[in-house]
């Protein structure tokens, strides 16, 4: 039986626009098991990115409970949350934030340098090959298309084989062919490296890859 690695119960999050309270997440609950893919759809601005940021410990929430690797996020200090994030979590954002002074390969290897791990160039180049980027490894971000930069950002997020990958609209900047290759890579790392994935998408085809499929509507998560 697969182990639960993330559990959110009745998460609530709101913002204020002047004096008006905006409820972004209402009683948001979700459970992620090892080797599982969860997809979340919903219209632009419905709170999908906020949900990922909260689940990935990048944003605070107003009430509720979040456990990652059986650790209650509200009961541990910021330094322990940072350690948990660095050891267990990878992110792919809508905006890739590649460092312009480094090549594509160097950008990908940055997480291994930060964590003091041995460079895994072979694994990195396998991922470049999977996404048809082998010829771009020595290119700088300014020399690459938006789609190429998005794919490199994904490789950077998974190079250390995190237990949980959060991907915010990972195919949003890709054409159909490259979107299919990216989906195939996500499926591969899920199966071969037991990585669990939560991703948001507008694309119905991408949503189909989820073992569990949800829609976020008016702050509430629905199956």
Language model segments and positions:
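Conserved ABC ATPase signature
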Residues: 140-150
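Catalytic Walker B motif of ABC-type/P-loop ATPase nucleotide-binding domains
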Residues: 165-168
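Helix-to-loop junction immediately C-terminal to a conserved catalytic motif
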Residues: 56
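Conserved ABC transporter NBD signature motif
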Residues: 64-75
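Short coil-to-helix segment of the ABC ATPase nucleotide-binding domain corresponding to the Q-loop/switch region
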Residues: 102-109
């Amino acid at each position: 039986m697969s182990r639960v690695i993330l559990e959110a119960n009745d998460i609530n999050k709101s913002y204020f626009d002047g004096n008006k309270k905006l409820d972004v997440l209402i009683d948001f609950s979700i459970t992620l098991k090892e080797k599982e893919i969860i997809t979340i759809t919903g219209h632009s601005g419905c709170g999908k990115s906020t949900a990922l940021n909260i689940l990935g410990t990048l944003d605070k929430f107003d009430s509720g409970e979040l456990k990652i690797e059986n650790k209650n996020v509200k009961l541990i200090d910021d330094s322990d949350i940072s350690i948990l994030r660095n050891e267990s979590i990878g992110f792919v954002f809508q905006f890739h934030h590649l460092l312009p002074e480094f090549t594509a390969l160097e950008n990908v290897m940055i997480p291994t340098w930060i964590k003091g791990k041995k460079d895994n160039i072979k694994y990195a180049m396998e991922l470049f090959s999977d996404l048809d980027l082998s010829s771009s490894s020595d290119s700088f971000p300014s020399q690459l298309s938006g789609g190429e930069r998005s794919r490199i950002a994904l490789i950077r997020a998974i190079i250390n084989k995190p237990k949980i990958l959060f991907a915010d609209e990972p195919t949003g900047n890709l054409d159909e062919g490259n979107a299919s290759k990216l989906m195939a890579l996500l499926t591969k790392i899920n199966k071969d490296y037991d990585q669990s994935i939560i991703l948001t998408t507008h694309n119905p085809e991408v949503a189909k890859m989820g073992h569990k499929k949800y829609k976020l509507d008016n702050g509430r998560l629905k199956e």
